[in-house]
């Protein structure tokens, strides 16, 4: 819900409740972190919530706003440590798009202002959530985004209701549609059940 906090309490609560309802339907106890601002991300009691967590999930909203809230904060530093120790990270929409060096400001009105700094945890990579419907929102968006992928970088487009699940190096596609990978100018598309060998370069590994 952090990525939607700037939209107001109704939006934040809506995303939070969706998450609680989803995990509740699976019989999994879940808690919404009180993480709306950079001040929250500096509070020891928020980072302490990671202790004993079995997973962390960031939902949708504006990925640039999410990055602004957490990048360079004690919360994110603690989360990186937890991920290295084995804590699973899951994200949909903004929750995955925020992870890279640059991300999308989804409040922007045109392509010229769409790019913003991301968290920079996943390097040399760009994610494209909602890949199969992005052009219905902004005509020409898929061509623009794919054309913005840096030389030597990897682009990963994730269709609606589709996920890639793995250990950071090997992945399996789950869902109704596909994952689209652009590497060295070549597209490869993967459907449900197919495996992707794609190690994601992480900032903490490069340090």
Give short role names for the model-derived ranges.
Residues 44-47, 79, 115-117, 145:
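Short, flexible, glycine/charge-rich loop motifs used to bind or transfer phosphoryl groups or to couple energy/partner
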Residues 31-34, 57-58, 89-92, 155-158:
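General beta-strand structural signal in soluble alpha/beta enzymes
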Residues 4-17, 21-25, 103-105, 109-207:
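C-terminal and late-domain segments of enzyme folds
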Residues 47, 53-55, 64-85, 196-201, ...:
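Mature, structured domains of secreted/extracytosolic soluble proteins
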Residues 6-65:
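Portal/gating segments that form or line small-molecule/metal binding sites
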Residues 12-13, 43, 69-72, 138-139:
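Conserved strand-to-helix beginnings and helix N-cap segments that scaffold or border functional pockets
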Residues 59, 65-136:
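Class I SAM-dependent methyltransferase SAM-binding "motif I" and its flanking Rossmann-like core
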């Amino acid at each position: 819900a952090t990525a939607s906090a700037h939209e107001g309490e109704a939006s934040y609560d809506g995303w939070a409740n969706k998450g609680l309802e989803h995990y509740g339907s699976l019989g999994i106890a879940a808690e919404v972190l009180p993480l709306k601002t950079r001040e929250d991300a500096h509070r020891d009691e928020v980072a302490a919530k990671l202790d004993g967590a079995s997973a962390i999930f960031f939902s949708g909203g504006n990925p640039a706003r999410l990055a602004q809230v957490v990048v360079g904060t004690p919360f994110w530093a603690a989360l990186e440590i937890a991920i290295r120790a084995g804590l699973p990270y899951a994200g949909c929409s903004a929750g995955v798009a925020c992870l890279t060096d640059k991300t999308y400001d989804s409040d922007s009105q045109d392509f010229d202002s769409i790019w913003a700094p991301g968290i920079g945890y996943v390097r040399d990579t760009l994610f494209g959530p909602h890949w199969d419907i992005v052009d219905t929102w902004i005509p020409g968006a898929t061509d623009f985004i794919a054309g913005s992928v840096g030389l030597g970088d990897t682009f990963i487009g994730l269709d609606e209701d589709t996920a890639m699940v793995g250990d950071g190096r090997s992945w399996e596609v789950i869902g109704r549609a596909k994952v689209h990978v652009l590497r060295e100018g070549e597209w490869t598309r993967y459907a449900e059940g197919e495996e992707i060998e794609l190690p994601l370069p992480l900032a903490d590994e490069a340090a």
